[in-house]
Curated annotation (Swiss-Prot):
It comes from the Bacteria. It comes from Xylella fastidiosa (strain Temecula1 / ATCC 700964). PANTHER family: ANHYDRO-N-ACETYLMURAMIC ACID KINASE. InterPro entries: Anhydro_N_Ac-Mur_kinase, ATPase_NBD. Belongs to the anhydro-N-acetylmuramic acid kinase family. This is Anhydro-N-acetylmuramic acid kinase. GO terms for molecular function: ATP binding; kinase activity; phosphotransferase activity, alcohol group as acceptor. The lineage of its organism: Bacteria, Pseudomonadati, Pseudomonadota, Gammaproteobacteria, Lysobacterales. The gene is anmK. Catalyzes the specific phosphorylation of 1,6-anhydro-N-acetylmuramic acid (anhMurNAc) with the simultaneous cleavage of the 1,6-anhydro ring, generating MurNAc-6-P. Is required for the utilization of anhMurNAc either imported from the medium or derived from its own cell wall murein, and thus plays a role in cell wall recycling. The keyword Transferase applies. Pfam families: AnmK.
Length: 381
């Protein structure tokens, strides 16, 4: 995937590289993008790839993020360094495949790996591992990271952070739109023709679906939703899951594996539980129902729902969303020439550009922060 130099353009739009690993911890997404100068309204994906986690490191991160394990200070320091090394390796691997020089990339935007997200309480916090100093050192590229904590310090949820990016590249003056990221957790961005943008998590998505599937199969996820399609929705289990008070919380709200993990679901199983396929079908329906309910409640006149994330490749989930939203066009962002697997990584490249240009990138209407804030810490090359 060589990238040609801009011989005809002495001032090409700068290149940025975004790095992202979500709540599923199923890989490190790296996206190389070319971003227009301010106002930033267009991002061109130049190259992208997903790097696999070391299996033992992934297991440790999953256990830590789900509250199933505690770690000593030494272990946390080691994990921070390991995640930073893994992110730097993912960046360098992609750069090597493109044939461009590291010096052609203005900055890396790194999300890191969330191990705890506690946006409520007397002293809320969010914590992402991935030593950005190490990323900058090993790549030789200025790295912007730690995007969420400034918003939390300003009274916000620190999530979701993609709505400003979604608005910039997918907003429309002609129809009310929504963007749905179906990653480990499902989150919505509501983009009305006029008025403030809203964004919030709606509940679990691939985090539960993948975990349950992996318990019963050797593969990592339910390819094309076939396992869910082979089962039947268990209405009693679905009602028990929907009874969780988190679902009735109003936005702004965000969540993670510490809230919605496999133990949370298995506690609801009856003494004679449904078949594994029926549970998978029910978990898929949980995602579809909670997304549809949230969308209809918060933006009932939505015309179009654009899907990104791994769930965009699950035709069964896409069909259930369409069933629950009969008056909404439900489609993948691929329709608009965007890769659904790398939109978040592109978004963190965009956040890095915003920060280096001195532009705030949180939306108080989304996170609940006291105002616009410049996000992230800059680690020079």
């Amino acid at each position: 995937m060589p990238v040609h130099d801009d011989h005809c353009n002495p001032n090409p739009a700068p290149l940025y590289l975004g790095l992202m690993s979500g709540t599923s911890i199923d890989g490190i997404d790296a996206a190389l993008v070319r971003i227009n100068a301010n106002p930033i309204t267009h991002c061109e994906l130049i190259a992208a790839q997903t790097s696999a986690w070391d299996p033992n490191l992934r297991t440790t991160l999953l256990e830590l993020s789900q509250g199933q394990n505690t770690a000593s200070l030494d272990q946390l320091g080691w994990l921070d360094a390991q995640v930073g090394l893994a992110f730097a390796t993912a960046a360098n691997t992609l750069i090597a495949k493109t044939g461009i020089k590291h010096t052609q990339i203005r900055a890396i935007g790194s999300h890191g790996q969330t191990i705890r997200h506690r946006p409520h309480g007397d002293l809320p916090f969010t914590w992402q591992l991935g030593d950005a100093h190490r990323i900058a050192e090993l790549t030789g590229i200025t790295t912007v990271a730690d995007f969420r904590r400034r918003d939390v310090a300003a009274g916000g949820q620190g999530a979701p952070l993609m709505p400003a990016f979604h608005l910039a590249i997918l907003g429309s003056a002609n129809e009310n739109r929504a963007v749905l990221n179906l990653g480990g957790i499902a989150n919505l961005t509501l983009i009305p023709m006029t008025g403030p943008v809203l964004g919030f998590d709606t509940g679990p998505a691939n985090a539960l679906l993948d975990s349950w599937y992996q318990r019963h199969h050797h593969e990592t996820f339910d390819q094309s939703g076939n396992f869910a399609a082979s089962g039947k929705i268990n209405q009693k289990l679905l009602a028990c899951l929907l009874d969780d008070p988190w679902f009735t919380l109003p936005p702004p709200k965000s969540t993670g594996r510490e809230q919605f993990h496999l133990d949370w679901m298995t506690k609801q199983l009856e003494p004679t539980p449904p078949s594994p396929a029926d549970v998978q079908a029910t978990l898929l329906e949980l995602t579809a129902v909670t997304v549809a309910d949230a969308l209809l409640r918060q933006q009932p006149k939505t015309t179009r729902l654009l899907i990104c994330g791994g769930g965009a490749h699950n035709p069964v989930l896409m069909a259930r969303l369409a069933t629950h939203l009969p008056n909404v066009t439900v489609e993948s962002i691929q329709t608009y020439g965007l890769n659904p697997d790398y939109l978040e990584a592109m978004g963190f490249a965009w956040l890095a550009a915003q920060t280096l240009d001195g532009q705030p990138s949180n939306l108080p209407s989304v996170t609940g922060a006291r105002g616009l804030r410049l996000l992230g810490a800059i680690h020079p090359a």
